[in-house]
Regions:
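Basic, ligand-binding patches in group-transfer machinery
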Residues: 1-149
Length: 149
């Protein structure tokens, strides 16, 4: 489902410590995170917090490098980016019992040379603006960043 009249968000990835980013965060299926496209041009999907007001959360796209075997937990890095809300009419139609889900979409442009080459698992982190509750969940999707020439 194409995001309705939304522009592709310019990527602004930041490298962070996985341990610090997910400190006090709970992996929870109440954060429904889905990626529909993770191709060479864009990452597109949606995320919805079930049972809470979605307007109260800041959301971040999180990329987990797959090649972290042998690294200590404290040394593991992830790539994060604040995602801007994109209108998704079908979320509102299909989840009428959930609050403020229409802006649950995201569509981020892929640009080469912003990430190190490798395979990445894609997840979403949601932070409540008032209580600072942190929820995260994987999307079950992966993407590959090719070597830069």
């Amino acid at each position: 489902y194409l995001t309705d009249r939304n522009l592709l968000q310019e990527p602004a990835w930041q490298c962070e410590s996985r341990q610090e980013l997910l400190e006090n965060a709970r992996q929870d299926d109440c954060l429904m995170a889905r990626v529909e496209t993770a191709g060479p041009e864009r990452i597109q999907g949606y995320s919805v917090i079930l049972g809470d007001d979605n307007a109260c959360y800041d959301k971040f796209l999180v990329l987990f490098p797959e090649d972290t075997q042998g690294q200590r937990e404290a040394d593991r890095k992830v790539w994060t980016m604040n995602i801007l809300p994109a209108y998704r009419q079908e979320l509102e139609e299909n989840l009428p019992d959930q609050k403020n889900v229409a802006l649950g979409g995201f569509c981020v442009k892929r640009k080469t040379e912003q990430l190190p080459p490798g395979n990445y698992g894609i997840a979403v982190l949601a932070v409540h603006r008032i209580s600072k509750l942190k929820l995260w969940n994987t999307t079950g999707k992966y993407m590959t960043e090719e070597k830069h020439v």
